[in-house]
């Protein structure tokens, strides 16, 4: 005879004294359709083996098992076994949402949008009806984007070991419908043809949901500009025609009344009026809305310098049933200026602290304009009161006093803020309830409110957050903290109480990885800040999510505990990942306009088209490693390089290694074609997000070609000889810029030192050092001052080296030389350096041909004043560049601004100029015009002897990105 007691979330019926009750339980079993085991539920099962079978205990066990959220249904079976009874809990396991994937997503939609539309959050229970709802949600999104014929099939894969279910939504999108026509219903006030022209929708278009919203927004703006402030537009219906795969849009338009808004007594543009008046945003015409508009206009005119401006509202005129007129009357008063403010009576809070929250400000030549209005002042007074309350002065009062005749000048306003601080409220007793002695000992020192210190409501809220964070980071995800304060029995003394309800501590039973098809499990687990058998730490979950995103291997990462809404203490943590495409192909093209290579020493103004290709493969071998190939081709250079990047080497998060190999041939120096073959290895140590040190070894073979008629014939055999360079170098970089592409604040510093040595495989021994420092200062919201300084030197060392060169007649000659190979010398000039020269035209030149031959020292200092307009879309730059390339560090004379002769190039060139910028998604598009104040003179040997020439004073540059 079997006795069954069932639990489906309600009380089980009592059974009247069957023969099994009271008999000893010899064994307890658990049978489910998932891999759940009895030891996991020791706390929930109160009926124990060896005890008499008790109906109340069995019923309580069923209740507790069901409360874990692990079961859809449960029952208890009791069967005789010898002299006792076997108690079996039989249940149907509940499954939880795991990885949700969508395949077949049509363009222009993306899979992440459709996954979000399913509304199936990771780790939550999956109910029977939710799958159908999720499928319908995806269909709705597809229909909203004109995929009416799309079909969506859902499939699930249950994992009994983890109780998670993987959901796959397969889309067959069909063809996107085209627009057949647009009809308008309602009181539109304009013809359908006029409104259709406004939307930008045309027959034959494939309209997505964003494009429809954009068209509706255009109609709304169309009405707004014509005074229909209460107009409403929405899609009433979308009619699909299956035979032609087209759709009709039915748009409902209600124009509403025409509302004229006039401002009398002062001028203001219609555009500005639409921007600042509330009724243009919400369309509400009532007294509170009109009064808000009055205050906004008062603030506007006072900031314009009319410090006593007042704005009143005239009664609303109803011209017709559908036509109203609203008039604001402005009394500007005399124009004035705001001279400044001061604090009086602040004995405990410094002027500097108080001034840090003020928004009103006097004008300061040359960059800062004045800002003042009574509204700004009221907001500042509230901010000052907040500062005082945070310092314990709960009753502080601040009264402004206005002096409109400051320094005996009429309409020159000075404000004195008279502060009555009052008594400071102190903290009496601190009562931390609901915690253990160990927890109290850990928490009390970290609280902002401390006994004997000043009391602050702000600190009370901070303490609540501190306590809550302490518990949630230790597995108490359901913790609650109630903060309260009460008078301590004497004046200006507050007792503070924190009532804590921690709930049950949750621990991580296991970590389940989902979606890492190609990425190795170890790569993922190394980034996790939590492990099994640790308390569930919400901060660790968020930190792990951030670290996985930082790998660059995943498009989306979600981390959540399974079954989060129950009081179950042993949690599975799910890590769901959507892997990014492993292969990426990028290509581009462009044109560079500068003085490029020619037979003339100064070059000719030419356009250089260029194309580039980049192919990268992430996750090589399932690891966090990247292989990249890059190729480029232009009239200036051509080349290719391959790199292999290994971050976190070997498992250190602060060390990375990069292997590089490249081959290129470039003509960016007029004098020669530089051919280079190079291999290098770079190891980088990152100290922080802004600072890192790198060490690199590079081995390259360089050669200068096409030297005929560009340098003296006697120098060609040595200069054209191929040279091997083996160099070890260290670099230090400190980057505090707010935006590396277009910085407005911060600084950037780099220092690099290298040695080329025969012991490293080099045929030329020389030392090289370079340094750069750039700083950026925002002077006003629309003006940035930027400075960049570069210094570089190189010097040969050691004994003269024996070099075998081949003469033009084929004979070989041994030469003793210290010369640094031509492609290894410094060159300067161009859009991102010294804009008084074209690309790489600065510095020493050959005394016979006049072509640049580079130098062993370089200095550049650039100053820029950057202005922005049109909401930062346009910009103007005024710049001054100074510097040059020098033959050696000993001949670097920064204060020498002239040449002694046409063969003396060791002087400093100054260049002034202006640049124009247009912001694009890839960076600022920049056109610069540079003017050399003291351009270089050089000599050229001609048929009639030496001829002295001068480089052009004016240079033109077109490029993308800021110069530094």
List PLM regions with ranges.
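Periplasmic polypeptide-binding modules associated with outer-membrane biogenesis and secretion
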Residues: 15-597, 610, 614, 628-646, ...
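Residues that define the transmembrane beta-barrel architecture of outer-membrane proteins
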Residues: 134, 215, 293, 380, ...
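Transmembrane beta-strand segments that form the barrel wall of outer-membrane beta-barrel proteins
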Residues: 528, 560-561, 585-603, 613-634, ...
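C-terminal outer-membrane beta-barrel translocator/porin domains of Gram-negative envelope proteins
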Residues: 550, 572-573, 584, 590-604, ...
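Repeated loop/turn-to-beta-strand initiation elements of outer-membrane beta-barrel proteins
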Residues: 555, 583-585, 619-627, 649-657, ...
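Outer-membrane beta-barrel architecture
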Residues: 574-576, 614-616, 628, 643-645, ...
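Residue-level signature of outer-membrane beta-barrel architecture
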Residues: 617-619, 646-648, 663, 685, ...
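Transmembrane beta-barrel wall of Gram-negative outer-membrane proteins
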Residues: 636-722, 730
């Amino acid at each position: 005879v079997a006795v069954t007691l069932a639990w489906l979330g309600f009380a089980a019926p009592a059974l009247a004294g069957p023969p099994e009750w009271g008999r000893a339980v010899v064994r307890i079993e658990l049978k489910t359709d998932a891999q759940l085991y009895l030891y996991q539920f020791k706390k929930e099962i109160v009926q124990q083996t060896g005890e008499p079978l008790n109906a109340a205990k069995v019923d309580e066990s069923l209740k507790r098992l069901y409360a874990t959220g692990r079961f859809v249904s449960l029952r208890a079976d009791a069967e005789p076994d010898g002299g006792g009874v076997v108690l079996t809990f039989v249940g149907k396991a509940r499954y939880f949402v795991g990885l949700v994937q969508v395949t077949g997503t049509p363009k222009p939609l993306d899979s992440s949008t459709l996954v979000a539309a399913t509304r199936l959050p990771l780790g939550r229970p999956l109910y029977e009806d939710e799958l159908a709802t999720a499928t319908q949600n995806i269909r709705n999104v597809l229909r909203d984007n004109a995929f009416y014929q799309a079909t969506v099939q859902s499939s699930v894969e249950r994992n009994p070991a983890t109780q998670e279910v993987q959901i796959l939504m397969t889309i067959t999108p069909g063809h996107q419908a085209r627009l057949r026509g647009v009809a308008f219903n309602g009181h539109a006030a304009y013809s359908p043809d006029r409104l259709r022209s406004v939307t930008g929708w045309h027959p034959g278009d494939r309209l997505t949901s964003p494009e429809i919203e954009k068209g509706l927004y255009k109609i709304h703006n169309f009405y707004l500009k014509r005074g229909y402030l209460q107009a409403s537009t929405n899609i009433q219906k979308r009619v699909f025609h299956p035979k032609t795969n087209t759709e009709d849009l039915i748009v409902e338009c209600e124009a509403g009344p025409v509302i004229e808004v006039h401002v009398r007594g002062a001028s203001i543009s219609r555009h500005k009026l639409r921007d600042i008046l509330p009724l243009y945003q919400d369309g509400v015409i009532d007294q509170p809305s009109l009064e808000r508009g009055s205050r906004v206009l008062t603030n506007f005119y006072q900031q314009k310098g009319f410090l006593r401006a007042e704005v009143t509202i005239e009664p609303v005129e109803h011209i017709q049933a559908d036509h109203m007129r609203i008039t604001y009357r402005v009394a500007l008063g005399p124009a004035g200026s705001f001279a400044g403010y001061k604090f009086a009576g602040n004995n405990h809070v410094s002027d500097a602290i108080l001034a840090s929250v003020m928004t009103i400000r006097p004008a300061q030549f040359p960059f800062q304009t004045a800002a003042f209005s009574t509204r700004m002042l009221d907001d500042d007074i509230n901010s000052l009161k907040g500062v005082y309350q945070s310092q314990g002065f709960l009753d502080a009062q601040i009264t402004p006093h206005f002096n409109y005749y400051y320094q005996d000048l009429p309409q020159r306003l000075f404000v004195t803020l008279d502060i009555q601080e009052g008594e400071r409220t102190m903290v009496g007793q601190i009562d931390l309830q609901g915690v253990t002695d160990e927890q109290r000992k850990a928490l009390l020192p970290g609280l902002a409110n401390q006994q004997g210190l000043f009391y602050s409501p702000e600190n009370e809220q901070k303490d609540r957050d501190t306590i809550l964070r302490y518990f949630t980071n230790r597995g108490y995800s359901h913790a609650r903290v109630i903060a309260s304060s009460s008078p301590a029995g004497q004046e200006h003394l507050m007792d503070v109480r924190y009532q804590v309800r921690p709930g049950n501590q949750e621990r991580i039973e296991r970590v389940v990885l989902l979606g890492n098809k190609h990425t190795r499990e170890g790569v993922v687990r190394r980034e996790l800040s939590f492990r099994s058998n640790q308390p569930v730490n919400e901060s660790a979950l968020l930190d792990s999510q951030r670290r996985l995103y930082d790998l660059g291997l995943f498009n989306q990462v979600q981390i959540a505990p399974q079954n989060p809404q129950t009081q179950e203490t042993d949690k599975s943590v799910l890590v769901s990942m959507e892997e990014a495409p492993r292969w990426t192909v990028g290509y581009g093209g462009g044109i560079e306009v500068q003085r490029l290579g020619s037979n003339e020493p100064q070059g000719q103004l030419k356009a250089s088209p260029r194309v580039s290709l980049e192919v990268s493969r992430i996750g090589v071998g399932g690891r966090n490693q990247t292989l990249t190939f890059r190729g480029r081709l232009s009239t200036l250079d051509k080349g290719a390089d391959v790199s292999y990047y290994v971050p976190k080497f070997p498992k250190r998060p602060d060390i990375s290694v990069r292997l590089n190999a490249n081959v290129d041939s470039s003509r960016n120096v007029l004098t020669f074609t530089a051919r280079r073959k190079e291999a290098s290895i770079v190891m980088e140590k990152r100290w922080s997000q802004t600072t890192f040190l790198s060490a690199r070894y590079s081995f390259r073979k360089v050669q200068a070609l096409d030297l005929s008629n560009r340098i003296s014939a006697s120098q060609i055999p040595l200069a054209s000889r191929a040279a091997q360079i083996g160099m070890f170098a260290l670099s230090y970089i400190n980057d505090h810029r707010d935006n590396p592409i277009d910085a407005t604040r911060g600084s950037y510093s780099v220092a690099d030192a290298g040695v080329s040595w025969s012991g490293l495989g080099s045929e030329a021994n020389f030392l090289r050092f370079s340094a750069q420092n750039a700083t950026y200062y925002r002077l006003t919201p629309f003006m940035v001052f930027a400075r960049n300084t570069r210094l570089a030197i190189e010097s040969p060392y050691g004994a003269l080296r024996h070099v075998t060169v081949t003469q033009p007649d084929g004979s070989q000659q041994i030469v003793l030389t210290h010369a640094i190979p031509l492609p290894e010398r410094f060159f300067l000039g161009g859009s991102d350096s010294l804009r008084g020269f074209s690309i790489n035209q600065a510095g020493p030149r050959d005394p016979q041909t006049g072509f640049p031959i580079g130098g062993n020292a370089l200095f550049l200092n650039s100053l820029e004043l950057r202005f922005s307009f049109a909401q930062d879309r346009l910009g103007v730059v005024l710049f001054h560049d100074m510097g040059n390339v020098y033959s050696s560090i000993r001949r670097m004379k920064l204060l020498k601004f002239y040449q002694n002769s046409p063969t003396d190039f060791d002087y400093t060139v100054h260049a002034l100029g202006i640049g124009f910028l247009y912001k694009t998604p890839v960076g600022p598009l920049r056109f610069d015009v540079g003017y050399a104040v003291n351009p270089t003179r050089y000599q050229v040997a001609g048929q009639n002897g030496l001829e002295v020439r001068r480089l052009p004073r004016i240079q033109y540059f077109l490029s993308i990105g800021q110069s530094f």
